[in-house]
Amino acid sequence: MEIENEQICTCIAQILHLLNSLIITFLDDDKTETGQSFVYIDGFLVKKHNNQHTIVNFETYKNKMKVSDRRKFEKANFDEFESALNNKNDLVHCPSITLFESIPTEVRSFYEDEKSGLIKVVKFRTGAMDRKRSFEKIVVSVMVGKNVQKFLTFVEDEPDFQGGPIPSKYLIPKKINLMVYTLFQVHTLKFNRKDYDTLSLFYLNRGYYNELSFRVLERCYEIASARPNDSSTMRTFTDFVSGTPIVRGLQKSTIRKYGYNLAPYMFLLLHVDELSIFSAYQASLPGEKKVDTERLKRDLCPRKPTEIKYFSQICNDMMNKKDRLGDILHIILRACALNFGAGPRGGAGDEEDRSITNEEPIIPSVDEHGLKVCKLRSPNTPRRLRKTLDAVKALLVSSCACTARDLDIFDDNNGVAMWKWIKILYHEVAQETALKDSYRITLVPSSDGVSVCGKLFNREYVRGFYFACKAQFDNLWEELNDCFYMPTVVDIASLILRNREVLFREPKRGIDEYLENDSFLQMIPVKYREIVLPKLRRDTNKMTAALKNKVTVAIDELTVPLMWMIHFAVGYPYRYPELQLLAFAGPQRNVYVDDTTRRIQLYTDYNKNGSSEPRLKTLDGLTSDYVFYFVTVLRQMQICALGNSYDAFNHDPWMDVVGFEDPDQVTNRDISRIVLYSYMFLNTAKGCLVEYATFRQYMRELPKNAPQKLNFREMRQGLIALGRHCVGSRFETDLYESATSELMANHSVQTGRNIYGVDSFSLTSVSGTTATLLQERASERWIQWLGLESDYHCSFSSTRNAEDVVAGEAASSDHHQKISRVTRKRPREPKSTNDILVAGQKLFGSSFEFRDLHQLRLCHEIYMADTPSVAVQAPPGYGKTELFHLPLIALASKGDVKYVSFLFVPYTVLLANCMIRLSRCGCLNVAPVRNFIEEGCDGVTDLYVGIYDDLASTNFTDRIAAWENIVECTFRTNNVKLGYLIVDEFHNFETEVYRQSQFGGITNLDFDAFEKAIFLSGTAPEAVADAALQRIGLTGLAKKSMDINELKRSEDLSRGLSSYPTRMFNLIKEKSEVPLGHVHKIWKKVESQPEEALKLLLALFEIEPESKAIVVASTTNEVEELACSWRKYFRVVWIHGKLGAAEKVSRTKEFVTDGSMRVLIGTKLVTEGIDIKQLMMVIMLDNRLNIIELIQGVGRLRDGGLCYLLSRKNSWAARNRKGELPPIKEGCITEQVREFYGLESKKGKKGQHVGCCGSRTDLSADTVELIERMDRLAEKQATASMSIVALPSSFQESNSSDRCRKYCSSDEDSDTCIHGSANASTNATTNSSTNATTTASTNVRTSATTTASINVRTSATTTESTNSSTNATTTASTNVRTSATTTASINVRTSATTTESTNSNTSATTTESTDSNTSATTTESTDSNTSATTTASTNSSTNATTTASTNSSTNATTTESTNASAKEDANKDGNAEDNRFHPVTDINKESYKRKGSQMVLLERKKLKAQFPNTSENMNVLQFLGFRSDEIKHLFLYGIDVYFCPEGVFTQYGLCKGCQKMFELCVCWAGQKVSYRRMAWEALAVERMLRNDEEYKEYLEDIEPYHGDPVGYLKYFSVKRGEIYSQIQRNYAWYLAITRRRETISVLDSTRGKQGSQVFRMSGRQIKELYYKVWSNLRESKTEVLQYFLNWDEKKCREEWEAKDDTVFVEALEKVGVFQRLRSMTSAGLQGPQYVKLQFSRHHRQLRSRYELSLGMHLRDQLALGVTPSKVPHWTAFLSMLIGLFCNKTFRQKLEYLLEQISEVWLLPHWLDLANVEVLAADNTRVPLYMLMVAVHKELDSDDVPDGRFDILLCRDSSREVGE
């Protein structure tokens, strides 16, 4: 029997072997490789090339095959291919699974065409509605013909839908996971084809459902967390005994990850009625509760406040299994085992899952290029499944807690059955996870390490990783050091951390009492904290928004390497949440400094709840220094850069908000500030802690030399193994030491009892000191083994003592005794006399010359000589400022040494003026000295400016005393030195008796620390100067007087500046000229000083409207009274000593810079140092002025002018106060000045009077002319007995109306402008005395004047007949006295408006000629309508009296009545004398007109000051504050009126400059850039910052300003700073490319390399493609702009045959290109002519550059070996760029692929960007526009696999990357 059985088995085996051979033969016949290139698979011919398989057409390729292959395939059956070829649908079904397994698949979108009913593929030309209806399929592409492509999709043969759901083979994994089948039974979850169509909605809108799930969970959690405290708890896998609260505290990032994990299951819930897996629920009986999915979809929309009440009720019903709702939750929980594709990235553990399981989905992943997955993957891994269940539990607990009365359903003992089942599922999954997490770890003694899952992990691995992170930290630090003087890590460690004077003794967590709101920063003395902050470098601009952003980004980036350094330095690893929550302050603080070892110690908890005892881990010295540096320096820099308005962080439950009475009222700004001052590792850009996704990126690249990289979990297990096996114990208590190591690694010793032989151990089982000691020993062992201390060299003997660093501050005693220093000979930097000349050219231009030889020699003396102290006396207006300004600029140009100088002035009002003057042209960085006193030297400022009080302050003295030590610590160099100490008007030290007590502190200043001291004054003779210098502690003047020509260098400077006599240079004596001779000085005794002063001011402003004046009053009360009474006449600024310092500075600056301010009123403090160009008059009302104050006041008139000293008659009895100089005396002012300066007296001699006592011989021509004009005006006023009140009228009227003619008139609006201006200028003065100019103007501009004059004297009937049809008699008489031109003007245009203007401008001469030559008929007519008196006067004789009567009666009132009713006579209501009005009466009767004119004038001056026009090239970018080099590349060329949409700033019939009525015109004479043009450019700037939709909304928002460009400019200027910052931020990349020419490399664009073949092409290939495209366009005569706009290949032969630009544009307009462009694209947001005018002269520079490059293109074609073809001419090239600019689809893809560029919204910027060069894949340079054309071609190419790119998916991916 046994033999028979064996024979039977042998026969069966032979049969099976034979069958197997037959099957193999059959398969070989069906799938036969017939050659090296082709394969036959199921009716298709597949071509193999480079391991790529492609379906081809046999008929096309048969001639390319071998003869034997062709014979074999001729017999093959290609019916399947023929079927696909003949199918009209783009999507063709294919049942061959072998084909889909052999050929790469892709995902494409398809839609059903409504017209034909065919299935078509989605292309870029597909409409939006078809896209919305599209669906995705996994397909294989087939080229069935030339440019004909079909797509095969797998469909099984005749599926039987009646037999039930189709088992999904995509859910059967290759590696069986028993748990998901036995516990979750995933094999029973079967989906039919309808289900897959429904599930495709989820993949198409995954982002939406991610957001929906997150919002729902967030809302539920907020409501659940607000419930009153509930005592119920639930047991967890990690805390199975005591349990945790049911509603656990979750971070917002955790809620977001949970929400993303829940997205597929939320989708299932919302579609329970459609999916077949819920068949049990769908079979519910009538009356049972159903889920209203439509209501759920409405309530849970993430775009609005989420309403979760109904959702909460559904969740409660599912938990309680009401009706059949429990079946829904049951299915959803089982579906958790399914992998619905790529979930949220960035969670801790994702990478471990991929590494551990090595799972591969059945369907090849097509998610690598950002494409959506439309099929389910293999089941979830245990770890991912556990995370999903975590999310489900959180959602169920939170949602049920929203409406449930209590949470008993979640009770461990009495809870509902559903919850118990969930707990069982979770526990089983957790146990499975523990099994999966077991790592294969083996010891590798040879390499001093271990093997983790076959990957070597040893000390070299850790050290390589650590020092790579340290190098990354240092590199980022260097970037900051380029902009700042950054202290090094060693500097800060030596100065503070290692300094034993700084104590860090404080209680710590787990050892002593815990203190809230503590930080080790509070333990650092303030004097150290002030000097650790870095200072800006000299070559760096001020803290701009771009620089602040650079600081925050750099510090965010270096946070991650620091985290890794800590991770490796502690040795016993952290879980990521523990590392993430390290805090150096606040209630969750866990970072401390050990006072003994000066190392950083970390106290962290085992889990997030902090339920276990803290673990102590000590860092090594090197890492401690870096952590300390990060907290004390870098974080403080980051806080300063972010500013007080930073509010990116939101309140999160994990965050303890302390210090607020009501935490619910805490704003995001408060939260952000708490976080910045507490937590270490932040992502300030996103407003969150550093995410795991960012942290783990380093694992993929580091260490560089490791062949295999470990993931985070493997690395954690490897660190634990290293601690166990490689780091040995050296103590007697080995058991405790080993157990401590396990606890520090966050392991429970209970889990290792088999290893250690103990059942339990915790640090509470030993004393607190022992616990600390054990943990410190464990850290010490790790540090010693890793060897970080051997790389850390901290030589305390070589580092400076902290006492030396702050010696200056410590040495300052209560008595402020001066610090004695050892003076030395100062090192000299190479200087040249040419430096001063270069500095002058920088400041004043290339034509700079010195005033005289004295000024040149003094500048050289100050700059070149070794004289330590110099005093200069020069007359006011000489240019004393330039004596130190030019040397300061020369010092600043020295790159090897940084000089910091100080300037002090006597009064606060001089600060603003000095800073404006000294900072012009950007030659010096100037700042207030207060900044230096409060913050120290910033490393950028060249000159600090302050007042005498600052010079005398203790803080300033102390900072100067400690200068060298602090600078060496802060800037790590000795090349930052103190430069000049400059004191202006130093005579005040002696003359200001009442302030001498304030100057006492100056004597404590260490003058020896400065390079040189310079003392300047215009009123300091030798006696005053010597006394002033001695009063501040200096030696005084040199005993031997020095001449300016003596430029000997002192050889011995060892005594120091303070003990060296000051050398005096007295330019007044040298020149022997009396100062102030250029000013006309007048002494007047008057009855009323204010009244006389007002007369003088009004007269000055009538003559010189743009001039300014200063009035010096005697008391503060008088200052305020004058300001109140004069402000109705002109704009006034007043200042006196009772105002605050800031207010004084602000008002002085306003007067100097605001051109509309006329008068500065103040006490004598306004007489010193102020330089005002328009100043023409100084009036002094102070009776107590001494000679110094007089000279200083008159000295403000730099270029000449008038000075009036007004005193009351018989009241000059002022006495000098004790110790002060006596007041000036009555008499010759020049002689008193000579006496003061010690000049030779000329009393009684020739030349005694210089600019005084009526002498004009030494005055300038302009000053003499001004005096004469003032005298003439005074005589005129005296003759007419004019009142003071009337004086401003002419001045105001001329400004408001007469000037309008100069700049408001235009050709099309000339008549209206003339008439309006004529009416406005009607007044008594004009009529009473008509000058020749007016008459000529009237006769030339319009000859209707004469006619209207006749009509005034004629009845209404006559006037009408004349206007409508002038009879022969009247016309003849008129033409006799009027030229032919006048007659023509009358006959052609006679209107009411003309009559008005004529009536008001009739001259006496015209009236006489008209009256004497009017025909008898007319005279009779006139007589009949004229009063007897007038008739007699007129008819009897035309004499002067009659003329005067006629002229005087022509006034505003008469004109109005004449125009209203022509029947009324001009002199009807009285005789001529009664109608003669005085000018004052006339103005008073027209108060409304005068007020209106005043308002226009005031508005005009305000606008002129606010929007100055300095040149014709002025643009709005200058107004925003951009530098010239930035404006060059952001310049808004091509922006004109056509840029504005129709109706925006385009009104007609108004002033072209301001779009206002001509009588309200606010334009000013000489304005070079109109307000309307500035408004166009401002609108363009707003367009720069907005996309199309945002710009549309913006145009709607500014609709009130569409007709008011001036109002819009005001609205725009309010956001000036914000707009500037936004442009700097949004266009930083653009400026980097266009201005700094940073290179764009396609290889740096990851998305480009993955998503486009163009980015993998060489430069040669791109150029060939570019030339090929243009060759094709030229051959086909395709319309270029339309083609690049939307790939429409319309013909336009005229475009290619056009000879010039005009014909070219006409051709485009003829075919309707511009019209289509406006209707289809964003070009509709501009004017109708905007695009058309781009072909004119807007882009001349770019055109010239392009035409010069045509030769280069020809050479390129020859080099490429292609036939030279014509490259496009300029107009075609510009058409291409405009088309690409308006092609939204193309631009979206280009911006997605080319990561170095972003969006631009202005065509000029696009054109500039297109012409930059990029590096192709082979590092050859090509213009960007060639790359653009290649990408454009790829988008239109169906034969490029990656050519068709879904823009919606592009944007989703970019948003995901951004998040």
Swiss-Prot record:
Swiss-Prot/TrEMBL keywords: ATP-binding, Helicase, Hydrolase, Isomerase, Nucleotide-binding, Repeat
Region (Disordered): 1318-1485
Gene3D superfamilies to which the protein is assigned, alphabetical: P-loop containing nucleotide triphosphate hydrolases
Annotated ranges, domain Helicase C-terminal: 1095-1244
Residue sites binding ATP per the record: A874, P875, P876, G877, Y878, G879, K880, T881
Pfam families: DEAD, Helicase_C, Sir1
Domain named Helicase ATP-binding: residues: 861-1038
Domain of life: Eukaryota
E.C. designation(s): 5.6.2.-
Cross-referenced InterPro entries: DEAD/DEAH_box_helicase_dom (IPR011545), Helicase_ATP-bd (IPR014001), Helicase_C-like (IPR001650), ORC1-binding_dom (IPR037240), P-loop_NTPase (IPR027417), Sir1_ORC-binding (IPR021646), Y'_ATP-dependent_helicase (IPR050978)
GO biological process: telomere maintenance via recombination
Biased segments, Low complexity type: 1318-1461
GO terms for cellular component: cytoplasm; nucleus
GO MF terms, alphabetically ordered: ATP binding; ATP hydrolysis activity; DNA helicase activity; nucleic acid binding
Biased segments, Basic and acidic residues type: 1462-1485
Description of what induces expression: Induced in absence of telomerase TLC1.
Described purpose of this protein according to its UniProt entry: Catalyzes DNA unwinding and is involved in telomerase-independent telomere maintenance.
Stated family: Belongs to the helicase family. Yeast subtelomeric Y' repeat subfamily.
Protein name per its UniProtKB record: Y' element ATP-dependent helicase protein 1 copy 3
Annotated source species: Saccharomyces cerevisiae (strain ATCC 204508 / S288c)
Phylogenetic lineage: Eukaryota, Fungi, Dikarya, Ascomycota, Saccharomycotina
